[in-house]
């Protein structure tokens, strides 16, 4: 079973449908309606942290989830979830070089990564964010696997 932590974002259920098309055993939980102990009892195979409004430190249980389960359970962060992973490991999130609200831009893979399996090295993706993880402030535990055409961490 997979867990999708919903950070109160309408895109969460798009993720739910996509993940469910691969593995229908998925449970959605709100970022302020579940505890670490409850997540542990559910024994998820993977955790996905959704997009959402605000900054990572305002994303409910996301940073505690990352700190508790990183290295034990695969965790994927999308937008706000991605930023929460950055901050949980001691990285810095700041304003993006350019605000991206519903714009399509080219994303460039860096090396091979299972997450992007089957996609070309460069592919178009929708971007919708005002914040970004700062590459120069990433801890060495985190590896950049994709960048935008302007060099921001994806």
Where does each model-flagged region fall?
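Amide-donor transfer/coupling interface in amidating biosynthetic enzymes
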Residues: 2-4, 8-11, 17, 21-44, ...
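Glycine-rich nucleophile elbow surrounding the catalytic serine of serine-hydrolase chemistry
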Residues: 79, 83-87
